[in-house]
Regions:
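Surface-exposed beta-strand/loop patches in noncatalytic accessory domains
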Residues: 55-74, 100-148, 242
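Beta-sandwich interaction modules
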Residues: 126-160, 168-186
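Beta-strand-rich structural segments
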Residues: 204-223, 322-324
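Short acidic/polar inter-strand loop motif in beta-rich domains
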Residues: 157-159, 168-181, 279-287, 380-382, ...
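Flexible, membrane-associating and regulatory peripheral segments of lipid-active enzymes
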Residues: 101, 376-465, 469-474
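Solvent-exposed serine/threonine-rich low-complexity stretches and specific carbohydrate-binding patches
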Residues: 115-143, 234-236, 243-258, 350-376
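Short flexible loop/turn segments that cap and initiate beta-strands
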Residues: 81, 216-249, 333-342, 349-353, ...
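Lipid deacylating catalytic domains
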Residues: 439-675
Length: 675
């Protein structure tokens, strides 16, 4: 059995403010827990969903413009900034200021066709120079990673060039950055830009790029956007490296309407990128749009060699395939490994047999390093295939970002004659759990009951799990026989988060999960890749989630940009971007997804008012949404959709109540939960 055992140490500290929350439970004890990886597989009809995503399909649609504000001193001694911003929206326009010092700025906005500027009056709102103009404050962010914002809203104003003037008596340094803040304009125009990475191989030394184009959202009607040629006048890319260096690249505008800029990444760490597009709509109105992106670059680790150099039987029905690799540094990290197995059918055609994968550690023999990949021989019998066999679409990925270290189209797989004979004697007609997950370890081996220093409790529990950069969100009075997972106000990858949940859950013999936001994805990750108390639990629903961005959120990139001026806060999160989420989902089989029961929510609606969860995040999200997660991005294909409910928002800082406080839903989840 491919068993990897290590210890995860978790020290969780709860702040005094969070301890005062009425539903907070006692702090989690520090525990040590063994982790056993699963040897995962999937049937042939899932192979298409388990391929690496095309980055062209995981891009960001933008109807907004984010303009950097950099104050300079004028002759009068004032610090000032002025900009003219073309915008084609003619119905409703929102203007938002984001800066640590925005409350000390004097702001004047002149609408298209007007000569009188409208000053911001923070005590009385906007002076009524335009019908329906309003001033408001809000918070922009995700869970507790929030930044203060000021918003100006105009109704029924003409399209054209907006002029914004900002002055300040003093220049307050913003963390040594050249940018003091950001001005955001967002409207209701159908003309948007679609921007995507051209590669997910985000490894040091690689040349990657961003591609953008303008499209008409009304014509796209929810389908994959297509470029409208001739609308882009100019496009630029502003790239910020991990060391803070900022480079600006002109983007080449092609005849097909796509603008492209390529660059080489030479440093490990987090990058932010902003694409700015200016052009004219089909009716001749000038516009500006931007899109904001965050992505990590990882160090190179391995190269794949050309063939499987050893196949050995490691247990009843189990084979270990040794994939030879070459380490390109002195680091040999664990990897996510995935591959399709193909063989020849009775007609002589090569056909898929299964998809296999999981998290694995490199091993060493006299001939060098290899990665063990496990295959259940019963898949070969089920597919009724014979030699020759081969692996296709092989990928080695980083366990925390799912970024590919290396890929290969195909590798020849030669099985020993004894294995071929064993397969010929089989008559497998159905798939069982062991074929999908590998052999299970002993039930007591996944707890910490053999560690005298641990806080082993035993029994079964319902784990209440929070999300990214979050505190205690679940009112515990709505639940019974529960244990509160506490890793408050932290930024974890799905893999790190999953291991921490397992560490907490190892106090018990079995558990089910109710999770909020990222906690739902981390719980699914745990069930997919690791053996845990989830696998020995009983009940109607294994994992239940509320407000989980399974397909990502558009806020992730903007949060990274704001970190440059406000401070990092909880930091950027690749798994919560559209790109990172799609890479992660490409390794999650349907047998794991089918054990998830998910809920989505959005704001309440009334015909006579403008509806939202958060005024600030609404500028970046498509309706319906909960202030963080768009309804479409909260869907998990292959899982159980428990419905969409209005009148509930992502957190308690939004207009409608927090979705985790819904008593009726919580009581229902409690009654049906595994434990």
């Amino acid at each position: 059995m491919n068993k990897r055992k290590f210890f995860v140490f978790m020290a969780l500290i709860m702040s005094l403010s969070l301890a005062a929350v009425s539903w907070a439970a006692p702090a989690v004890d520090t525990v040590e827990s063994p982790i056993f990886t699963k040897q995962i597989a999937a049937p042939v009809d899932e192979i298409d969903s388990l391929t690496l995503p095309d980055p062209a399909t995981t891009g960001l649609q933008s109807r907004w413009a984010v303009v950097p504000v950099s104050l300079t001193q004028n002759r009068a001694g004032e610090w000032a900034w002025q900009s003219e911003i073309p915008f084609d929206s003619s119905e409703r326009l929102s203007v938002m200021l984001l800066s640590p010092h925005a409350d000390q700025w004097q702001v004047r906005v002149t609408a298209p066709g007007r000569t009188a500027a409208v000053p911001m009056d923070r005590h009385n709102g906007f002076r009524a120079a335009y019908h329906g103009a309003a001033y408001a404050t809000a918070q922009f962010g995700l869970d507790h990673n929030q930044f203060p914002a000021e918003l100006l809203t105009f109704e029924r104003v003409p399209a054209g060039t907006w002029q914004v003037n900002i002055t300040a008596n003093n220049h307050l340094a913003t963390r040594g950055q050249t940018v003091d803040g950001y001005l955001v304009l967002s409207g209701d125009s159908d003309y948007q830009i679609y921007t995507h990475l051209n590669s997910h191989e985000l490894v040091v030394g690689q040349s990657i790029g961003l591609e953008t184009f303008v499209f008409n959202a009304a014509e796209a009607d929810g389908q994959q956007p297509q470029a409208d040629p001739g609308l882009i006048g100019a496009a630029t890319l502003r790239l910020t490296a991990p060391n803070g260096q900022v480079d600006t690249f002109p983007m080449q505008v092609n005849r097909d309407g796509r603008a492209v800029a390529n660059f080489t990444v030479n440093e490990v760490g987090g990058y932010t990128a902003q694409v700015q597009v200016e052009g004219q709509t089909a009716t001749g109105e000038r516009f500006m749009r931007t899109s904001e992106h965050a992505f990590p670059v990882i160090a190179a680790a391995y190269r794949l060699n050309e063939r499987v150099n050893q196949v050995r039987v490691i247990g009843q029905n189990r084979l270990e395939l040794a994939l030879p690799i070459t380490a390109v540094s002195n680091q040999t990290p664990d990897v996510m490994l995935g591959a399709e197995v193909w063989g020849r059918n009775a007609d002589g055609d090569m056909v898929p047999v299964t998809w296999v994968g999981g998290i694995t550690s490199p091993a060493e023999t006299r001939t060098g390093l290899y990665l063990p990949l496990n295959l259940d021989m019963r898949w070969l019998s089920l597919a009724d295939t014979k030699p020759p066999y081969e692996l296709r679409n092989i990928r080695l990925q980083d366990v925390d970002t799912q970024i590919p270290y290396a890929t290969a189209d195909s590798i020849r797989l030669v099985l020993p004659r004894s294995v071929e004979t064993a397969v010929e004697r089989m008559n497998v007609t159905a798939v069982n759990r062991e074929m999908l997950m590998g052999p299970a370890p002993a039930a007591d081996s996944i707890t910490n009951n053999d560690n005298p220093a641990s806080a082993y409790v035993g029994g079964s529990r319902l784990l209440l799990v929070h999300g990214y950069c979050s505190g205690g969100v679940w009112p515990t009075g709505h639940f019974s026989n529960y244990s509160v997972f506490q890793d408050f106000n932290q930024n974890r990858s799905h893999n790190q988060f999953a291991q921490l949940i397992n560490s907490h859950g190892s106090q018990f013999d079995s558990f089910g999960i109710v999770a909020h936001s990222q906690g739902g994805a981390a719980s699914l990750h745990l069930y997919t890749y690791y053996w845990s108390g989830l696998d020995w639990s009983n009940g109607n629903r294994l994992i239940q989630s509320v407000g989980t961005p399974y397909q990502g959120t558009s806020l992730a990139g903007m949060l990274a940009v704001l970190g440059d001026i406000f401070g990092a806060g909880c930091g950027t999160h690749w798994d919560l971007t559209y790109d990172g989420a799609s890479l992660w989902l490409s390794g999650i089989p349907s047998w794991a997804r089918s054990r998830v029961y998910y809920h989505t929510t959005s704001f309440s609606w009334a015909w006579w008012r403008y509806d939202y969860c958060s005024l600030a995040t609404d500028m970046f999200l498509s309706d319906p949404e909960d202030g963080v997660v768009e309804r479409w991005a909260g869907q998990l294909s292959g899982a159980n959709n428990m419905g969409h409910k209005t009148g509930w928002c992502h957190t308690d800082s939004m207009r409608d109540p927090a979705q985790t406080h819904d008593y009726n839903r919580n009581v229902n989840m409690n009654a049906n939960a595994n434990r």
